[in-house]
Every structure is written in C-alpha cells, then in structure tokens.
Amino acid sequence: MKTNGHFKDFAWKKCFLGASVVALLVGCSPHIIETNEVALKLNYHPASEKVQALDEKILLLRPAFQYSDNIAKEYENKFKNQTTLKVEEILQNQGYKVINVDSSDKDDFSFAQKKEGYLAVAMNGEIVLRPDPKRTIQKKSEPGLLFSTGLDKMEGVLIPAGFVKVTILEPMSGESLDSFTMDLSELDIQEKFLKTTHSSHSGGLVSTMVKGTDNSNDAIKSALNKIFASIMQEMDKKLTQRNLESYQKDAKELKNKRNR
C-alpha cells in the first residue's frame, strides 16, 4: 500500500509538472522579426540643365503635408525636410536665389520678404500609403491550446494615394498666380508587404516554435523613396525659369497695386 502511494504521488507530481510546462509555453508570445533592408534615402538630382542666374529671389514656404497613420513620425519629418532641400536645389538650378521661410503660412512673410521676393512657392497635400483592397488578405490566428500560432497576418500590396499641390504666389499681395496638383494614386508604385502582429490571445504550444516576419516597414520606405522621386521629377518639369518668368507681368502689377 505504501509503494502504491509513492507511485500515485510521483504520477501526480509528473502530471502537475507537465501541466505547468504547457501553461508556461502557452503563455509565451511568438517572436516577430522585423526586416530592415531598405534605407529611406529620398534622393533626387535635378534633370534640367543649370541655367543662367537671375537677380531674383523666390520665397520657399515649408511643405504642409499630412500623412497616413502607417508612416512613422521620423519618416514624415525627413520627407518634409528633403522636399524643402530638393525644391530649393531645383529653383537654384533655374537661376534663382531662394529664401527659406520657416512657416507653411503665407501670412507669416515679413514685410522685407514680401518686398524682395519675386515669387513664393507653397506646397500642401496628403501623403498616403494603403493596402490595395483587391490584392490584400488578412489571416487571424484562431485560439487553441496546441496549434494556434498567436500571430495575425496581413499580406498584400501597398499603393500610394493622396495628392501634392504646388501654388505659385505673389508675396506682397499673397495672391495665387498659378498652381498644379499631382494625384499620387496615378503613380505606378506597388510594394509587396507582409505585416505580422501578435494576436489578442497568446497562442498554443506551436507558437513557441514559430517566428513571424514583418517587412511592412521596408515596404513603406521603398514606396516613399519612389513617391518622393516622382514628386521631384514633376517639380523639375514645372518649376523652370521659362515657366516662372511667364508670371513676371502679373506679379509686378500685383506688387505695385499693393504698394499704392
């Protein structure tokens, strides 16, 4: 009877230990590996040839862009800063001196800036990246003690949306002389992505052996690089000396009218 009691005690402890291990393993979240293989470069080199310098100054306002929620704040800031730098480079390449205005609002021009600026360039818009609903699928992990991975997945194609509007202003009056808009949804940019997140439940035993992959951040950076290059290419075509000098008569009339 004593031997049988020891056997039962051992079996009970073994069962308890096994249950504890299972509980411990079930409580572990699966590991997600986020790839970091793409750099956010936002590069562009003006395609137009450098032209003869003019004795004219253009005021360049800071871009007033809004971004979709999946674009990180640091990417937003770099996109905005690089836009300012590259548009400045494009205008300088067209023979203009550029005065950077630390505001996106034309009402913040100083009187001196209004007086010396031939034109002003303002930019606003929405930079949006979204999954293509026709080519994106979602798979949620089902709860379970054994075979639940504990990982939810979204796999598909990231595409751009939104717009960028560029307005040419006469600084003294604040009047718009011209504008052009780029529809980002028309860009042929498609980035495959896999976004993996932890499920609302912890997953089963198999989740301890599963490693999830998430390359969605790389897809965002790659798409932003291409969007940026496309925007700058259009800027390069529109902000030429020939086009900008065509506003000279109207700009002069508006400035003189304001000075009266």
From Swiss-Prot:
Residues with a covalently attached lipid (N-palmitoyl cysteine): 28
Compartments, record wording: Cell outer membrane
Q: How does it sit in the membrane?
A: Lipid-anchor
Please tell me the species this chain comes from.
Helicobacter pylori (strain J99 / ATCC 700824) (Campylobacter pylori J99)
Q: Does the keyword Signal apply?
A: yes
List lipidated residues, S-diacylglycerol cysteine.
Answer: 28
Q: Where is the signal peptide?
A: 1-27
**What is the predominant subcellular site recorded for this chain?**
membrane
This chain belongs to the protein called: Neuraminyllactose-binding hemagglutinin
Q: Name one Pfam family in it.
A: NLBH
**Keywords assigned by UniProt, alphabetized:** Cell outer membrane, Lipoprotein, Membrane, Palmitate, Signal
Lineage: superkingdom: Bacteria
Against InterPro entries, the record matches this protein to:
NeuraminylLac-bd_hemagglutn (IPR007876), NeuraminylLac-bd_hemagglutn_sf (IPR038531)
GO cellular component terms, semicolon-separated: cell outer membrane
